[in-house]
Amino acid sequence: MNSISIFADSEFDGVRIDKYLSVVFPDLSRSFIQKAIDCGNVSVNGKTVAKNYKLKTDERIEYIPLEPVKLEVKAQNIPLDIVYEDDDLLVVNKPKGMVVHPAPGNYENTLVNALLFHCKDSLSGINGVLRPGIVHRIDKDTSGLLIVAKNDFSHRALAEQIKAHSFTREYRAVTIGHLKESSGRVVAPIGRNPKDRKKMAVTDKNSKNAVTNYEVLREYRGYSLLKLRLETGRTHQIRVHMAYLGHPIAGDFVYGTPRTKEELALNGQCLHAGLIGFIHPRTNEYLEFTSDLPLYFKKFIGGLTVDE
């Protein structure tokens, strides 16, 4: 495959090579670019470099695109709870326990498999074969609303809104214990946990700014029901921030320790994405959608004792 040669402009002096390439090739994900670097397909002045290499002005970068891997994600007739749909996008209410997109070792029964059956070829291709239409994600064991793009125009416009933090995203969660304040704003950067790379953590190292607003709606014996609104959308943000405050989400095996059989029965965090708002990419109209608390959530809080 032919290589691509480019020279680093002065504005990118000191910028990491992987970040630079993600700007030059906006349709490639950062993880795809990092894989190309790790495979030796990126060189600077004739020498292969690590993904954290920092560029200098006028250095010559050569990129050899990775050979495409032929992956076929099959369409599956899995029921979808579609809240809204038009020619550009759809809003889906994802159930707890469903993975959003395929990944190594898990290529079936995901939201993407269901979308491929429902939408056929009408999904954006920006995020590649494994993530068609996927603009943003919520965790497997988080239920609630997701936006799916049907074409690249919509995908780019929605992605820009996410980048600008102009999406409205509101969640409900049950957390362990009672918070000191009835409402608050958590401003704490989130990055990979240096001791466990599979987890995120509040850290100053290689982290991104993260802001979560919360309001206590009701207190139960040993638990609290919260409304949370995101200003940013980092991986596991709500789960990490609540654990950081000392009040992990009920049922969260990763950032907390489920204490009761009722928590264990949740099979993951008691967290629901109940509201999402955005500007429609084609009409420029603000749209907002809500989702009622699902059965697992209602059942859990129904078994709690309200604090008087």
Language model: regions and residue ranges:
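RNA substrate-recognition surfaces in RNA-acting enzymes
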Residues: 250-281, 287
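A short, aromatic/hydrophobic, helix- or strand-capping loop or linear motif
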Residues: 31, 202, 254
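Short, P/G- and charge-enriched loop/turn segments at secondary-structure junctions
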Residues: 78, 198-203, 261-265
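Conserved "cap/hinge" positions at secondary-structure junctions
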Residues: 46, 65, 240, 258-259
